[in-house]
Swiss-Prot record:
Organism field: Escherichia coli (strain K12)
Gene designation: acrD
Compartment(s): Cell inner membrane
Topological domain spans for side Cytoplasmic: 1-9, 360-365, 414-441, 497-537, 891-896, 945-971, 1027-1037
Keyword hit for Signal: no
Entry-linked SUPFAM superfamilies: Multidrug efflux transporter AcrB pore domain, PN1, PN2, PC1 and PC2 subdomains (SSF82693), Multidrug efflux transporter AcrB TolC docking domain, DN and DC subdomains (SSF82714), Multidrug efflux transporter AcrB transmembrane domain (SSF82866)
Protein name: Probable aminoglycoside efflux pump
Amino acid sequence: MANFFIDRPIFAWVLAILLCLTGTLAIFSLPVEQYPDLAPPNVRVTANYPGASAQTLENTVTQVIEQNMTGLDNLMYMSSQSSGTGQASVTLSFKAGTDPDEAVQQVQNQLQSAMRKLPQAVQNQGVTVRKTGDTNILTIAFVSTDGSMDKQDIADYVASNIQDPLSRVNGVGDIDAYGSQYSMRIWLDPAKLNSFQMTAKDVTDAIESQNAQIAVGQLGGTPSVDKQALNATINAQSLLQTPEQFRDITLRVNQDGSEVRLGDVATVEMGAEKYDYLSRFNGKPASGLGVKLASGANEMATAELVLNRLDELAQYFPHGLEYKVAYETTSFVKASIEDVVKTLLEAIALVFLVMYLFLQNFRATLIPTIAVPVVLMGTFSVLYAFGYSVNTLTMFAMVLAIGLLVDDAIVVVENVERIMSEEGLTPREATRKSMGQIQGALVGIAMVLSAVFVPMAFFGGTTGAIYRQFSITIVAAMVLSVLVAMILTPALCATLLKPLKKGEHHGQKGFFAWFNQMFNRNAERYEKGVAKILHRSLRWIVIYVLLLGGMVFLFLRLPTSFLPLEDRGMFTTSVQLPSGSTQQQTLKVVEQIEKYYFTHEKDNIMSVFATVGSGPGGNGQNVARMFIRLKDWSERDSKTGTSFAIIERATKAFNQIKEARVIASSPPAISGLGSSAGFDMELQDHAGAGHDALMAARNQLLALAAENPELTRVRHNGLDDSPQLQIDIDQRKAQALGVAIDDINDTLQTAWGSSYVNDFMDRGRVKKVYVQAAAPYRMLPDDINLWYVRNKDGGMVPFSAFATSRWETGSPRLERYNGYSAVEIVGEAAPGVSTGTAMDIMESLVKQLPNGFGLEWTAMSYQERLSGAQAPALYAISLLVVFLCLAALYESWSVPFSVMLVVPLGVIGALLATWMRGLENDVYFQVGLLTVIGLSAKNAILIVEFANEMNQKGHDLFEATLHACRQRLRPILMTSLAFIFGVLPMATSTGAGSGGQHAVGTGVMGGMISATILAIYFVPLFFVLVRRRFPLKPRPE
């Protein structure tokens, strides 16, 4: 094939240009994102039961839904929460790669059979099913800059005019509203009700009947009589619209003609639909929306569409209303991709300089440089064909591929130059001879490197998805690199290189002359050193065994994790006060935290958005969540201005706040997997010991974790048990008094929890009508005695006649995981300790709990455990496939061992570099380690291929090996140094995404340094030992 293109260089150029064109088109078509779709698809079922306690919700709603979620394909785990605010949610997480739409359909089908078992109030509110993740990709704050709108005006406008349009944007899974629209609020006065001998049910019945839209029909509708001359729509009663109209609703007409109207027994006003949240942006009253990504949607594209839609809506905002982006993930993605592109360009420049140093001829250096854009563009075409995206993983793989793809072209050019110098052949003749010599080595290198990465593509789960991005990208680049080296590079060598006279070399003057002298002198020393090693093999075998021991030691000592943490330009702060604390008490703590950020971190902080009433562990008056957005990475100090440094300082400051637990934490490495960095587990009650026993086990576990110095900030990601007022109904007394239990329940719900009655029209939008006791009549336990229920004889019976109340402790938020009662425990490893080690410690601590309690890992920790279990299999399969490819290449079962034995020499360097830099054994490191395995084998192949060929032609084994070492030293050092300098920008990068670049670059760089230094000595030793043990008969030339 090479000879064909040597004679037809224009044909080779045409193919290269076409490859570049297709790649260029692919780049503009490929989506951009931080990661591919790594988070498992989530389907969330949400139900509302106004006024219900968490225990009531769990018993009547949550468990009913859970028990019907059977027979779902690819379900990984299921979690549920029942909140004292009346909301229940069941989240089902499916294996990565599951079609989210199909998952939603299956969940909806199973839900249908559960609907009739749910309370009527829940059915009236509706049960929603959405494919959505757990974390926000955008948090938008809305503020009135001129103060013309109060917080409820802002919230109503946002809920009425912005929330729905944004929820219909393609890619949006769900939207959390930190505020609510207006509703018609009917605040009942129990004393006035009783004075008119009326009950709460009388009020709701009157509203239902008199606030209704009646479909009457038509005047002259078909079928009509002959000669009918008129057809018109008939309107009658319609929905009410104003508080005045509601006040005029007639509750009763007395015999004397007097009336009791709604305004006589209640205060009617426009009020908030929900009073759960209180939001602030940079200290000003605000409302907000949290945008969640639909499963399978592109984060970057969705965020851009949402912001574009907001810009369209903003032109209709009331005067003074503006939106601010309080939290977003796209800036980090853009910045990290830009940084990787910068790294890519730096790598190309460094590789060019290394090649020029060795080749010492601009034309010769230009040839492998031309191969770089051709192969990269071709790789983008392959990514497009596979439906992949431009993301952090594929770009990291591109940087790694830089060093790999120039190797093939370097080997070709270097060998052509050597033949021209030694034999005086023309460039065309030298190229033909060179390709005949090294074509087998090129194919062998491609096979081995492909063999290392191809098995990665077949692993499942989130880790497998990460592996696949690297695998497809690097293998595509490798295959294209070999094709370019056999098609374009020979054609370029034959046409671009200038002929050399026999014995003539480049670089005979100046710096290059000095460099060549030094290199040749060291090459001679190297050859003599190899000869000594071959004569003293036992000593070097002992050294090799010691190196193996060091490798195993480092492997066991290197801490583990899933993905490195990144400075994402934002973080969150959660606030939790003791149970029973009020919204105003929580707000005071929030104001303290705001003051700290704006005072001590003003050089780093762009904005602070706080929502009182919403927390990562649940909703309530005693919790708050704050979104901290930082200034651009370029505006912050690279050491003191990182998010990690800010969080560390904030943690020390917040430890002084005694009235609340304040936790500042980084977002999870992968959006949609957990709520923060660190580990995430569920403590489960397998024995059904009950809530109190589970809480005792939780407290015991947290106490044990607090005593362990390798753990930090281990906490329950939920709400603590709080005082609850239990109302006991004596049903015998109630029945004796003629009071219906349904009437008692309806009155309790209306008075204390609010009842949704029906809807009304407000400025062209349908909104809700709620009936509830006025605030002064539901503040104290004894207020229950103010309420009356009508018995079957028409008499008014007070609650004190059949009801008593008592205090007890209960949870405002109950959790379940995979069908068991559970509590979520989150935490972090102490500085210098990996999350993998922290997870091992937590597992050992759980074993100290009473029997019947166990743990399951969830979110990111689940994936970390999965990746840790897959890593040994990945290494083993890759090494096995490499061995088989080498066996096929050399037609020998023995020769591959001389290549395979070199692999640990690269691995120990990768481990040592990673360990010395304080990094961890994560997925990125594992990918880098596989790269090192392939490159270590590649260097060995360059020597073994030549030595084996000469040995088969009848040359002495010792001389053949030394000759191969002498001939291959320069290309080995050149390709290795090119690769090392190619990944140097990754290992030294700063700014967005530098954590991932360090994780990949450090291990690969360390591995290549050790593999290059050690392998050039050990490869000839292993080849000679293997050949002596398994000699071959020489083949005639």
